[in-house]
Amino acid sequence: MGAAEPRMEVCPYCKKPFKRLKSHLPHCKMRGPSISADQNVSQSKPAALAQKEKSPTRDLTRAKEKELEVDRPKRAVKAETSRASWTAAASPLPEGILGSVRITKAEGENKDQNQFSFQALSQAKPEVTLQRVTTPWSPASDATSPKRELTQDVSESKGSPCPSETEAPSLVSSVEPFLANQDRKYSSTQPHANPATSVGLKLGTVDPQRQKLRVKLLDVPLSDRHSPKSGSHGVQRVTPSVLSREEGSQDGGHLLGVSAHPGNTKTQKSESLLLGLHTGLLGKAPVREHQELGLGMELSQSKGNTENRMSVTNVQEGAGLGQGGKDPITATKAKPHTALELRNVFMPESGNQSLTSPAVTSTPEENAQFCGQSHVPAITLSVGSVRDVLEPTSFYQPHTAQAGHCLMSYSAQYPVPKTFVGHVAAVTSGAPPRSVGLEWFPELYPAYVGLGVLPRRPPPWSLAAQVPPLPTLQGRSVSKVPWWGRSSADSRSLEPLTLTTSSLPLMRLLGAVHKGWVQCNTTIKKSGVGGLTMLFAGYFILCCNWSFKHLKLQHWRK
């Protein structure tokens, strides 16, 4: 028995000796109900001590139990102090103060000091420091409570006497509409809040000085923090610009860029949205500082012979329109005749696969207002060919759609400088010829006219088909790119060839090879098996070519 005693270990829960305490602890029935919330933290401590001591007796076990009973009130006090700290953090402190809470703990025999330092963001000048000393609470300790310290600190920093209790509800009532406008960013102030009591700390009662501090923090403007006027003026409400706003007027539509308060022109600048029509070509439109620019859009569509129009209302403050700083909404109602009508949307005469071409027309009054006596240059884009022409034309000039091309013609609402037009014209006229080789792969150009989803045979390669009629050449520049440097879609365009005697044999050779290649390509695309075979064969040849070039047969020699 004497040899078996040192091997026995007493379970700290059921107080029974076991040879293998580790195997008993998971199955101990007294472990669950006997453990309280305070013993959860140190439940492994008695087991560890029991394992270290090989011969524990019942006296030692009882002594440990007494120590645990003595430690229980200390743990309860610590838990209450931690709860008190969180209660102080969750109590209704000034909601404008946001920042980091620095917790410094200095433990002593009878004192546990937690220091909360609330630092306000950017504009919040007064710093509030709360020091809490946990001692046995008594009425005498209320004289040095954090509430009194808070009142003293704020009164010293402000240098003004504390307002009466009757002023606090008025300040709160003045703050509440400001809080409602801020999308409920800050919760509304409750003047009669329930007091939240804790150990040695009272912060739930309504403090007029704290209400004043909250009002002072909310008086700081949020929009203009760096301006020198922010300190002198009162509450400045942030007026976010309304990006899209529907107006139930006769014109109807969306007013873009109209602010909620049109009278305040110093702090708001509205940028006009050009609907993606002129941003890519004309760059950014100039925005004047003291100018409210509203842009309305009205789209009325009808079928048949009725007009398809899209009117863009442009309201400006300037010498031409002379609104003189009025509301842009009323300016839109006053002058509806300043709309530019984009109409005369027609289909091309030919039956080819080309998109509709919107042409721009306007009335003489609109020309006199927006353009003056000069004409605004219209930018004409010819998609699918090298002949991108930039011609200064007037509003009255009709644009005719040509076969095989998609003509998109706009008119600029804002005048384009002549240097920009000349620069683009110089770039397009002096464009270098395209690289030889890409014309053998027409599938790389999905925007070319004539390349559809369904495979079809290419048109015959004849010189007669290349010569266009004379009316289509009027007012257009002839491309100087040689025939052999163009793609397959360009070679089928309606432009006469600039042939020379030196390039004639090469042209015939490349024309024959190109014709055979396109025909072979279209026939292979019809059959899926043949296309896959050609694809894998091409990849295999490329891989073999690369391996022979880079490895240089060193691997095969080994």
From Swiss-Prot:
Q: Which residues lie on this side of the membrane: Extracellular?
A: 1-527
GO biological process terms on file: cell population proliferation; mitochondrial DNA metabolic process; positive regulation of mitochondrial DNA replication
Transmembrane parts of this sequence: 528-548
Q: Which domain of life is it from?
A: Eukaryota
Q: Which residues lie on this side of the membrane: Cytoplasmic?
A: 549-558
Task: Provide the membrane topology annotation.
Answer: Single-pass type I membrane protein
Question: Where in this protein does the record put region Disordered?
Answer: 29-88, 130-205, 222-269
| Segments of skewed composition (Basic and acidic residues) | 51-81
Q: Where in the cell is it found?
A: Mitochondrion inner membrane; Mitochondrion matrix, Mitochondrion nucleoid
Q: What is its main location?
A: mitochondrion
Name the keywords, alphabetized. Membrane, Mitochondrion, Mitochondrion inner membrane, Mitochondrion nucleoid, Transmembrane, Transmembrane helix
Any single Gene Ontology cellular-component annotation: mitochondrial inner membrane
Locate the compositionally biased regions of type Polar residues: 36-45, 131-144, 187-197
Name the job this protein performs: Critical regulator of mitochondrial DNA (mtDNA) abundance. Binds dsDNA throughout the mitochondrial genome without sequence specificity and controls mtDNA copy number by promoting its replication. Also plays important roles in mitochondrial metabolism and cell proliferation.
What name appears for this protein in its UniProt entry? Mitochondrial nucleoid-associated protein 1
Lineage runs: Eukaryota, Metazoa, Chordata, Craniata, Vertebrata
